[in-house]
Swiss-Prot record:
Sorted UniProt keywords: Viral occlusion body
Domain of life: Viruses
CC terms in the record's Gene Ontology section: viral occlusion body
Job description of the protein: Major component of the virus occlusion bodies, which are large proteinaceous structures (polyhedra), that protect the virus from the outside environment for extended periods until they are ingested by insect larvae.
Bilayer-spanning residue ranges: none
Protein name in the entry: Polyhedrin
Length: 253
């Protein structure tokens, strides 16, 4: 016997089938560049390659991240993604109401640049806690988030997910993710997966999977890596005219 109830067994069997399909697909080999952009202009760049589809964790202690925030009198801070980009629709929030709010206490942003044969128009991110569960507490909308993460792509981020946001940029070629450091003591580890959604995806709880996994970052470099200058990082890792945004430091890529 497999030791699982029928529903668990079928779910695990379907999961194994998706992994097998993914590993034999043309999307199985990808490169991921992770850029940590601090609000003081410092950038850290990491690269990752792989084909494994394993729900790993970043194993980063969020409380170790310095908080460079300088909120204004309204408790807001400038963040890449506001202003010009928002007005021109280069960034689309999945908050449900078409907008998002950036609050004080945001320690850092992550930018994910994924390169490879991926369906960019249907790529999203999914977040996990240390034990593989959704990391939002129930009293902060965690139950809604756990349900929302099982829905189709457009329903993944709902307006209750204040501690994090992500957005599309330029047909999905990169992502900004913001974490609120007030949750750091309770949720010291964050794992994430990058998913490709099938066209016409429906609620996964209905039985048929709505997702095909593209990649999981199953390991992550330590943050002892030397900082790099933001301008150097931008010149090295962004293609002008492909990724266009104006950040809070005054120049446009």
């Amino acid at each position: 016997m497999h030791g699982l109830d029928d529903a668990q067994y079928l779910q695990q069997k379907a999961h194994n089938k998706r992994i097998s399909e993914f590993r034999s697909s043309s999307n199985s080999g990808i490169n991921v560049t992770v850029v940590l952009k601090y609000t003081n202009g410092v950038v850290q760049v990491y690269n990752w390659q792989g084909t494994e589809v394993i729900a790993g964790s970043l194993n980063r202690q969020l409380m170790k991240f310095p908080n460079y925030m300088n909120p204004d009198k309204h408790g807001r801070i400038e963040w890449p993604g506001e202003g010009v980009e928002h007005q021109h629709g280069l960034i689309r929030s999945n908050g449900g109401n078409g907008s998002y709010d950036i609050g004080a206490g945001d320690p850092y942003a992550m930018q994910f640049i994924v390169q490879g044969s991926v369906d960019w128009n249907a790529t999203r991110l999914r977040f996990f806690g240390p034990d593989g569960s959704r990391w939002m507490p129930d009293d902060q909308g965690g139950a809604s988030v756990r349900a929302g993460l099982l829905n189709a792509a457009e329903d993944i981020i709902n307006s209750k997910m204040q501690p994090l946001y992500f957005c599309d940029r330029m047909a999905g070629k990169s992502y900004y993710v913001r974490f609120d450091d007030k949750y750091a003591p309770r949720f010291p580890t964050i794992g994430f997966e990058v998913y490709r959604y099938r066209v016409g995806a429906t609620n996964e709880m209905g039985g048929e999977s709505a997702r095909t996994a593209v990649a999981s970052l199953i390991s992550f470099p330590t943050f002892s890596t030397a900082y790099v200058n933001e301008k150097v990082a931008v010149e090295n890792f962004f293609q002008p005219r492909e990724l266009v945004y104006q950040n809070s430091y005054g120049y446009t890529v």
